[in-house]
């Protein structure tokens, strides 16, 4: 069994490869982001001294559920900068969703809303605890934003939900956003 720190390194490597740079290890994603699992394992084995069981453990125990394993194929659940179509069906969101960010970013967000930046979608959480975890990855004073998802949806905005329960949309205009009082972390 790989140590926790090695599991984290493997997870980050696989995420990087599957989301951003499959070409760096000789992989080619299909249009929906899938690669043969055997091919990904070969790439992992060239970088880490681990077993098949170690790689499976990284996938199965990853707290962020970053990977989707289906049969003999694997892909990143979301977060791609390379061109993929995750083939997600539109979904009806809950009344509110949440986004973790920083006070510094909130200034720009108030003007332009939440933008997808280099990703294909804006990522939203179904609960404040997950949003706090996301915010904690950023430097600065953290803040949780509430998204009026049901109102957005009723006004024509599309939402999708990934296998690991991350909600996606193209853009969140600022009129649907408000900071949650006391949610700073």
Swiss-Prot record:
Gene Ontology MF terms: NAD+ poly-ADP-ribosyltransferase activity; tRNA 2'-phosphotransferase activity
Gene3D superfamilies: 3.20.170.30, RNA 2'-phosphotransferase, Tpt1/KptA family, N-terminal domain
Alphabetical UniProt keywords: NAD, Transferase
Enzyme class: transferase
The keyword NAD is assigned to this record: yes
EC number, UniProt record: 2.7.1.-
GO biological process: tRNA splicing, via endonucleolytic cleavage and ligation
Superkingdom, natural source: Bacteria
Pfam families per UniProt: PTS_2-RNA (PF01885)
Keyword Electron transport among record annotations: no
Protein function: Removes the 2'-phosphate from RNA via an intermediate in which the phosphate is ADP-ribosylated by NAD followed by a presumed transesterification to release the RNA and generate ADP-ribose 1''-2''-cyclic phosphate (APPR>P). May function as an ADP-ribosylase.
HAMAP family per the UniProt record, alphabetical: KptA (MF_00299)
Family, per entry: Belongs to the KptA/TPT1 family.
Protein name per its UniProtKB record: Probable RNA 2'-phosphotransferase
Gene transcribed to yield this protein: kptA
């Amino acid at each position: 069994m790989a140590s926790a720190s090695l599991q984290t390194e493997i997870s980050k490597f696989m995420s990087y490869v599957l989301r951003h740079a499959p070409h760096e290890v000789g992989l080619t994603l299909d249009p929906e982001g899938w690669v043969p699992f055997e091919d990904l394992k070969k790439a992992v084995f060239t970088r880490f001294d681990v077993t098949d069981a170690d790689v499976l453990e990284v996938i199965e125990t990853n707290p962020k559920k970053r990977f989707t394993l289906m049969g003999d194929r694997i892909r990143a659940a979301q977060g791609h900068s390379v061109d993929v179509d995750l083939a997600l069906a539109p979904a009806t969101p809950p009344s509110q969703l949440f986004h973790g960010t920083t006070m510094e970013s909130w200034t720009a967000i108030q003007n332009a809303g939440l933008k997808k930046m280099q990703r294909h979608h804006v990522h939203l959480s179904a609960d404040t605890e997950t949003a706090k975890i996301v915010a904690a990855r950023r430097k600065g004073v953290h803040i949780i934003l509430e998204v009026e998802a049901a109102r957005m949806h009723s006004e024509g905005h599309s939402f999708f939900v990934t296998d690991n329960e991350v909600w996606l949309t193209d853009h969140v205009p600022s009129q649907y956003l408000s900071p949650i009082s006391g949610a700073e972390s």
